[in-house]
Amino acid sequence: MAGVSLVLKGRVALISGGSRGIGAATVRLFAEAGARVAFSYRQERERALALEAECGGPERCVALEQELSTPADGHALVAAAVRAFGRLDVLVANHGIWLPEDAPIAQMAETQWRRTLAVNLDSVFGLVQAAVAQMDRQPRTPAEAAGHIVLISSTAGQRGEANHADYAVTKGAINSLTKSLSSELAPRGIRVNCVAPGWVATEMSAAAVQDPELGPKIAAGIPLGRVASAREIAGPVLFLCTPLAGFISGEVLNVNGGAVLVG
């Protein structure tokens, strides 16, 4: 990205779900900004290792295979990142699942409900818990931030999403978690914010965005007239972790082309 300087030089960032989509774009952008980056993946080892190599190899960027569906999984991922780079300054909790098939609440399987909450919420709790403990014990000067946490939500967390109540519930909870954590952690020098994308051109949303009937309807509902690129979500995430955002905490930043405004 033109204009990205080494604003995160000397910092270590952990990005969950970093092998594709918004996560991969964020890994690339943070590496360009000078950070050492650890990121998690669950499948597609070759893709993850290719991204690791693209962003500088194990000395600068490391891919960590990790299931994320329990608090213990979150703890394990933070521990692996700290083993790789010795510290942790930034956590971006990006991973999550969204099933493209409609699931009306009367027909939704309990297994789907519990799986979505486990991945999208339970593991985030573990990630945040372990990251905060690590940030708290790291030495810093009074002028330095102890750490930055960015959670990834969705417009569904504010507007709801028919036939995808499981997903919307988790994202609404992430919004609330952001504000609660900000109030709790700001006095300790840890800023917590959230980025809430709308429709983004990623593999997760491809079935809907590329559908010949649904795709144009999605674009028509966005004032800017198109879906976002993954890079356009990664940019605000990076911004929130830099000194330019040094007085921002507890915010849910909508990055959706104005879509919430016409909800």
Predicted feature residues:
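Alpha-helical segment proximal to the catalytic Tyr-Lys
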Residues: 133, 183-187, 246
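Residue(s) in the substrate-gating loop at a strand-loop-helix junction
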Residues: 154
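Substrate-binding pocket helix/loop in short-chain dehydrogenase/reductase
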Residues: 102-105, 109-117, 218
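Active-site helix of classical SDR
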Residues: 128, 170, 178
